Swiss-Prot record:
Expressed by the venom gland. Antimicrobial peptide active against Gram-negative bacterium E.coli MH1 (MIC=3.5 uM) and P.aeruginosa PAO1 (MIC=10 uM) and against Gram-positive bacterium A.globiformis VKM Ac-1112 (MIC=1.25 uM). It is found in: Secreted. GO terms for cellular component: extracellular region. This is M-ectatotoxin-Eb2c. Its main location: secreted. It comes from Ectatomma brunneum (Ant). GO terms for biological process: defense response to bacterium. Keywords: Antibiotic, Antimicrobial, Secreted.
Length: 28
């Protein structure tokens, strides 16, 4: 169950990862 949930979340979050990384780098 958790594996499937994680895969679904990863699919949804994947497009936003670059923006998140950029935001984190700006904060550091």
């Amino acid at each position: 169950f958790w594996g499937a949930l994680f895969k679904t979340v990863a699919k949804v979050v994947a497009p936003f990862v670059p923006d998140i990384v950029k935001w984190v780098q700006e904060k550091v």
